[in-house]
């Protein structure tokens, strides 16, 4: 906090008077200045040679008598008081205690001094520029009038008896401070003009800003505690992008980590041509871009996600999770409506929502939709009728089945080649109707009596899985779509397409990059 900050501003400061005691030890001889005809007893002025030490000011009593004699000799006035009486000087503290010559606030001329006097007299109420109770040390502050008391000029050094610069000098210009010492060192011993102080350059109505150290000391500790580093740092999440870069969950591919090898130079030290095609993973070189696009990199491997219940393979873990939801036990419905035959409308709705009965996988974008087969037609093996949609064919087959059941005639047998394709050979596993159903029901957590098996073609319900498969082999042999890459069979073309896209993508897909003919722009 700057000095003088807590000074009461209600009281207006008035010029301070100082009383100077006379000679207590006896009568002292008055010293007259040479300009007034008296003898000079002050120490000699410093010469051009080096000064051995700082000037020692005379005792206070001698300085008081010397200043009094100088004032009386230069200005006409009443006769001086006798030496026995105490001389009182009102408003002239500098006349009694002259300041040293190195004060930076010394005026240059009397006009400047008068102007400065009237200008500074309006600032008597400023708590910064004035002090309420000056100490004896403050009386030695360099002022404009005291500089000429013991100077080399015969007319009093060009100073005045004004105590303005003494009373209203800023605090940093006092004796013993670092600022005054620095100003004295900068001014030098020469008689050149003094450096202007900081207070003279400041507008009269402004209060000086405190230094940085004072501002830091005046700042409350709460603000210091709330530094910029006081905020809690947010938790930095460590994100690992390695899996996102090296794996493809849609295609089921992953890039293996290869050995770190230094780049090998070519034999002969020749530089590599610009037209060379090199795989960035396995570093194999190819002569043309087509061979580079068609090659199978050894670092790209297929990631398979196999279902533990039914051994189905998926390329994406999300598809496997969606598939495994079908293996969870369902709430068993009431026993009365458990094996109740479904109507054709309900069968259509179930087929539309769930897809094929034996293939409930997530449909792939590359599969063929159920709106039509690859040829766009579905043919009935009973009457050779053709339908554009599989749902229409199922309705038609259901009508055939109901008509045959009403007549009591046995259903027609499927062709011989279809029977050979349907029945497994001796090396293949034959599904057991009774034991297999029990094991499957035990694995899935379902009871055989509580679940009905629906025919995916005609919608007929059966109490067991074996009965459903026998029905499919005998009646709907033409509607079975076997996989040409594995012994799996499906009852719909979209189901077979989804199976091939998921389980056999490498055999089905071909590299078409850089092989598509460029079409002219429209």
From Swiss-Prot:
Keywords: Cell cycle, Developmental protein, Differentiation, DNA-binding, Metal-binding, Neurogenesis, Nucleus, Repeat, Repressor, Transcription, Transcription regulation, Zinc, Zinc-finger. It comes from the Eukaryota. The lineage of its organism: Eukaryota, Metazoa, Chordata, Craniata, Vertebrata. Residues 66-75, 212-228 have a biased composition (Low complexity). It comes from Bos taurus (Bovine). Residues 2-7 are annotated as: Required and sufficient for interaction with KDM1A. Belongs to the INSM1 family. This is Insulinoma-associated protein 1. Signal peptide: none annotated. The C-terminal region is necessary for NEUROD1 promoter DNA-binding and transcriptional repressor activity. PROSITE patterns: ZINC_FINGER_C2H2_1, ZINC_FINGER_C2H2_2. The gene is INSM1. One of its GO terms (cellular component) is transcription repressor complex. InterPro entries: INSM1/2, Znf_C2H2_sf, Znf_C2H2_type. Residues 339-351 have a biased composition (Basic and acidic residues). A zinc finger (C2H2-type) spans 277-297, 305-327, 378-400, 453-476, 481-504. It is found in: Nucleus. GO terms for biological process: adrenal chromaffin cell differentiation; negative regulation of cell population proliferation; negative regulation of protein phosphorylation; negative regulation of transcription by RNA polymerase II; neuron differentiation; noradrenergic neuron development; norepinephrine biosynthetic process; pancreatic A cell differentiation. Residues 43-57 are annotated as: Necessary for interaction with CCND1. Residues 1-12 have a biased composition (Basic residues). Sequence-specific DNA-binding transcriptional regulator that plays a key role in neurogenesis and neuroendocrine cell differentiation during embryonic and/or fetal development. Binds to the consensus sequence 5'-[TG][TC][TC][TT][GA]GGG[CG]A-3' in target promoters. Acts as a transcriptional repressor of NEUROD1 and INS expression via its interaction with cyclin CCND1 in a cell cycle-independent manner. Negatively regulates skeletal muscle-specific gene expression in endocrine cells of the pituitary by inhibiting the Notch signaling pathway. Interacts (via the N-terminal region) with CCND1 (via cyclin N-terminal domain); the interaction competes with the binding of CCND1 to CDK4 during cell cycle progression and increases its transcriptional repressor activity. Interacts with HDAC3; the interaction increases its transcriptional repressor activity. Interacts (via the SNAG domain) with HDAC1. Interacts (via the SNAG domain) with HDAC2. Interacts (via the SNAG domain) with KDM1A. Interacts (via the SNAG domain) with RCOR1. Interacts with SORBS1. Residues 1-112, 182-235, 325-373 are annotated as: Disordered. Residues 1-20 are annotated as: SNAG domain. Residues 43-61 have a biased composition (Pro residues). One of its GO terms (molecular function) is RNA polymerase II cis-regulatory region sequence-specific DNA binding.
